């Protein structure tokens, strides 16, 4: 079931990955997206047909090379030139941020259409900050007994460079002293970032050039997270929906791959919900999984009690190696937005034949050629910067 049920007002679906970093810039400032993110927005927007239906439209932003923004129908096809638009469109953003709202308000495609935007509330901004992941992890540590050594150290920028440097040195030493994690490095995360962006390892022992760069990053962003560098073995996510009444409901499991660096999304395992559940409960007990889901739902409902946010929420997990044991990190990050795991869920429902399994792939470069095992999800040229496809098990 879609978290955005079909309504009387047609919807405008907008794919705006990278919105987390945009949140760190005030609405008065012009935020410049990286070229890579602009190509992602331009080329991957048709994937939102997995969510759209009926009279819905999809907004495909302009490319970095000047290809203008365009509108697609719910099947992902270009609207004919001069096509009349609905008088109103209810905007459904991949992730909320003021900069995409301004882009849409100023877009000439919508001169004769009223766009209805979701509100961006203080509680939404609070939970979009990586500090929220710390707060949820602390709650799970207290309620369910997960190890406190997983908790990051959040360091706010000091009054000057020297003060910031002292704070960072102390935090790094504190993380190093823990029995958990790789002793040759720690992990640094910027406050508004996700899906591998704004995350980088810091080698130890600490070198002055690396410390100087870290001080600069902390000063620019206002804070950074420092946490143990763990050997990630398996990546999962718990996907939730939040209704207009504020109820948080479990939606689906997501089992995904990352690039060899371990910090960037590569693709999702496509199989039945029952099979995903069986796979995950082979690694932790069903009782522990249900307790985790219930605890996360409780925390999310409380933290979003004054929010008007409706839609998807993804909480990333991973299994890491601790000596001879495989252990669960129950909250790596919170994604208060639609996720690739949600798209993969609907790709499985809509494209994978009964009884088959596969992988949802998102890759740089042109698409794989269609075959009995490859199902392209985008119509792209040989010059495409990104491709998305399903690879069925043979």
Kindly label every feature range from the protein language model.
Residues 325-328, 336-394:
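C-terminal active-site "lid" helix and adjoining low-complexity regulatory extension at the edge
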Residues 154, 178-201, 222-232, 315, ...:
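ATP-grasp fold ATP-binding core
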Residues 2-51:
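N-terminal-proximal low-complexity accessory segments that begin disordered
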Residues 221, 250-253, 262-327, 363-366, ...:
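A long amphipathic alpha-helix within ATP-dependent nucleotide-binding catalytic cores
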Residues 154, 185-211, 237, 261-277:
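Glycine-rich phosphate-binding loop of ATP-grasp-fold ATP-dependent ligases
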Residues 184, 210-265, 318-331:
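Phosphate-binding site of ATP-dependent enzymes
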Residues 39, 250-275, 337-339, 346-356:
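Extended active-site and interfacial segments that coordinate phosphate-rich ligands
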Residues 37-47, 51, 59-176, 193:
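Conserved N-proximal alpha/beta basic substrate-recognition cap immediately N-terminal to
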């Amino acid at each position: 079931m879609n978290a955005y049920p079909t309504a009387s007002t047609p919807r405008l679906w907008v794919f705006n990955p990278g919105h987390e970093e945009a949140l760190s810039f005030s609405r008065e400032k012009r935020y410049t997206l990286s070229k890579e993110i602009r190509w992602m927005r331009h080329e991957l927007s048709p994937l939102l047909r997995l969510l759209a239906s009926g009279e819905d439209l999809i907004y495909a932003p302009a490319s970095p090379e000047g290809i203008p923004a365009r509108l697609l129908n719910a099947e992902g096809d270009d609207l004919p030139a001069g096509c009349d638009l609905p008088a109103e469109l209810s905007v459904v953003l991949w992730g909320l941020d003021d900069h995409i709202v301004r882009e849409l308000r100023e877009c000439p495609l919508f001169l004769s259409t009223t766009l209805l935007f979701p509100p961006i509330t203080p509680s939404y901004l609070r939970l979009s900050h990586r500090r929220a992941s710390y707060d949820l992890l602390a709650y799970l540590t207290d309620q369910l007994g997960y190890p406190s050594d997983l908790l990051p150290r959040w360091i706010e920028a000091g009054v000057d460079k020297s003060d910031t440097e002292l704070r960072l040195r102390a935090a790094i030493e504190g993380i190093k002293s823990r029995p958990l994690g790789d002793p040759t490095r720690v992990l640094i995360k910027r406050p508004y970032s996700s899906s591998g962006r704004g995350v980088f390892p810091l080698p130890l022992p600490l070198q002055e050039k690396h410390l100087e760069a870290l001080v600069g990053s902390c000063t620019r962003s206002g804070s950074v997270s420092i946490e143990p560098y763990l050997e990630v073995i398996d990546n999962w996510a718990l996907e939730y929906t939040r209704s207009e009444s504020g109820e948080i409901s479990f939606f689906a499991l997501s089992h995904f791959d990352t690039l060899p660096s371990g910090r960037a999304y590569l693709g999702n395992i496509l199989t039945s919900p029952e099979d995903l559940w069986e796979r995950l409960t082979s690694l932790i007990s069903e009782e522990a999984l249900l307790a985790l889901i219930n605890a996360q739902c409780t925390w999310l409902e409380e933290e979003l009690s004054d929010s008007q946010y409706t839609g998807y929420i993804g909480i990333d997990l991973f299994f890491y190696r601790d000596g001879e044991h495989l252990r669960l990190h129950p909250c790596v990050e919170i994604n208060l937005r639609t996720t690739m795991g949600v798209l993969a869920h609907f790709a499985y429902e809509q494209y994978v034949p009964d009884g088959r399994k596969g992988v949802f792939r998102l890759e740089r470069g042109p698409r794989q050629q269609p075959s009995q095992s490859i199902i392209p999800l985008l119509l792209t040229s040989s010059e495409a910067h990104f491709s998305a496809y399903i690879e069925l098990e043979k």
